[in-house]
Design a protein with these regions (language model features):
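Short linear sequence motif anchored by a di-proline
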Residues: 1-131
């Protein structure tokens, strides 16, 4: 994961800000700390209310193994401050993935300023505790 707020500062990510991708998902998982040190945790499944697919803002790069010359396509999911629901679940760092509204998919891929997407997704996420 990469914090969207610090992309320009981090050497691992600043050269890839223009390498944008959508990471498509139907759900994701987060852990809630039950105790102060995180030794006891509760796993949650997070999805949209309508169970539709959604997209995270991502960056990609190609890593080339210097020995074999084999190329591997890699990606990272961007994170931002948590919305109310995710702050309750991801209660240690209070972060969440950058979930893009449907109308923002094209804008993200076309290179709009990444800082314009540094906001917590506010609608229709449901979290279900898992055994």
């Amino acid at each position: 994961n990469a914090r969207i707020e610090t992309l320009e500062e981090k050497p691992a990510f600043k050269n890839y800000i223009t390498n944008r991708c959508l990471v498509i998902a139907t759900q994701f998982y987060e852990w809630q700390w039950i105790d102060e040190k995180g030794k006891s945790k509760q796993k949650y499944s997070v999805r949209s209310e309508d169970s539709e697919i959604f997209c995270f803002a991502g960056l990609y790069s190609v890593w080339q193994d210097p020995e074999s010359n084999y190329s591997i396509l890699t990606y990272t999911i961007l994170t931002t401050e948590a919305n109310e629901l995710m702050a309750e679940i991801h209660n240690n760092k209070k972060r969440m993935p950058v979930v893009l509204n449907n109308e923002h998919h094209g804008l993200w891929l076309q290179g709009e300023n990444f800082k314009d997407f540094a906001y917590p997704y506010q609608s229709d996420l449901l979290a279900t505790p898992l055994p």
